[in-house]
Regions:
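Conserved AMP-binding A3 loop
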Residues: 1-27
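Conserved S/T- and glycine-rich ATP-binding loop of Class I adenylate-forming
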Residues: 6-9, 42, 89, 155, ...
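Conserved AMP-binding/adenylation subdomain of ANL enzymes
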Residues: 24-41, 48-128, 136, 161
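Adenylate-forming
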Residues: 26-30, 98-103, 140-141, 149-153, ...
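Active-site glycine-centered loops adjacent to acidic/histidine catalytic or metal-binding residues
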Residues: 47, 144, 167, 189, ...
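Conserved ATP/PPi-binding loop(s) of AMP-dependent carboxylate-activating enzymes
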Residues: 187-194, 203-231, 251, 266-270
């Protein structure tokens, strides 16, 4: 069992009390959902105090009888991948986006790569790229924040599927993961099969607060019954604070944080995270935050953005 502290992005850090049963139920459901194998070699890049890394990158491969490999440092990732030949790599969006940007930069500089692609031999270029990752990498799992769809599609073209999942520390942490067979870019897959879920107060687009209940939900916050009562209701549902919607195949799309929701003067719900993802694609933007603001006595909010330019 563990007490893992949340990042504190929504308030003061709180210790989520997670039992052995929480972790093992999450591991078992994740294996069924994604389709991991005993022959898989997981490359561990993220720190183990991160619940995503601890469960999916450490406990999961050990429970399978698979292999768990560790990089020496961020600077030696490429070299270590060639040596360790992983089949699975778990990462956060920033790392995946930097790796893909570096691939793109190297391809632009390489005359051989440009010539091969011009000759219709892009598959050969992609095979050489995969060889740099050890030649056995069959999927990259992403969690922690939204990922640029261009990065997801770019890795797919290379022949390395990137599966974007969703979770939070309070759920040990996985809530929804895609499968290789049915992944839809822009979604985080389906809710794990041992969790019950509901969308609270959905709007006209179907987006509502995601609430989940099941064996991987924490006992509560350590020595903080008040904070526990704020997120776990009388029926045992954990209120995630995240807005989500479902498609016809039950794939989940995360729209943003409930507290960040902007309601404009026409009463329309606007999800700032979706706008931020579009603005961040501009090469001249280093960082951006989209927020709502009011002018005078207006009802509703206008939408604004604070942008940090890329030097």
């Amino acid at each position: 069992a563990s007490i893992l502290y949340t990042s504190g992005t929504t308030g003061k850090p709180k210790g989520a009390m997670l039992t052995h049963g929480n972790f093992t139920s999450n591991v078992e459901a994740s294996i069924r959902q994604v389709g991991f194998h005993p022959s898989d070699n997981f490359l561990n890049i993220l720190p183990l105090f991160h619940s995503f890394s601890f469960t999916a990158n450490f406990m999961l491969p050990l429970s399978l009888g698979g292999c768990c490999s560790f990089v020496r440092s961020i600077k030696t990732i490429t070299e270590d991948m060639r040596l360790l030949q992983p089949t699975v790599m778990l990462a956060v969006p920033l790392l995946a986006e930097k790796i893909y940007a570096r691939i793109q930069e190297q391809m632009k500089k390489s005359m051989a790569a440009r010539a091969l692609r011009a000759a219709g031999l892009g598959a050969l270029v992609h095979r050489r790229i995969r060889a740099r990752f050890g030649g056995r990498l069959r999927l990259i799992g992403i969690g922690g924040a939204p990922t640029d769809p261009a990065t997801l599609r770019g890795f797919q073209r290379i022949g390395i599927p990137v599966l974007e999942g969703y979770g939070l520390t309070e759920c040990s942490p996985g809530v929804a993961y895609p499968s290789l067979a049915s992944y839809v870019v822009g979604t985080v897959g389906q809710v794990l099969d041992n969790l019950e879920y509901k969308l609270l107060e959905p709007d006209a687009t179907g987006a509502g607060e995601l609430c989940v209940r099941g064996p991987s939900v924490m006992l509560g916050y350590y020595k903080n019954p008040g904070a526990t009562a704020e997120v776990i209701d009388a029926d045992g549902y954990l209120h995630t604070g995240d807005l989500a919607r479902l498609d016809d195949r039950k794939n989940l799309t995360i729209c943003g944080r409930r507290k960040a929701l902007i309601v404009n003067r026409e009463g329309k719900n606007i999800y700032p995270e979706e706008i931020e993802q579009v603005i961040e694609r501009c090469p001249f933007v280093k960082d951006v935050i989209v927020l709502g603001y009011q002018v005078g006595g207006e009802t509703g909010e206008r939408v604004g953005a604070i942008i940090v330019p890329d030097d």
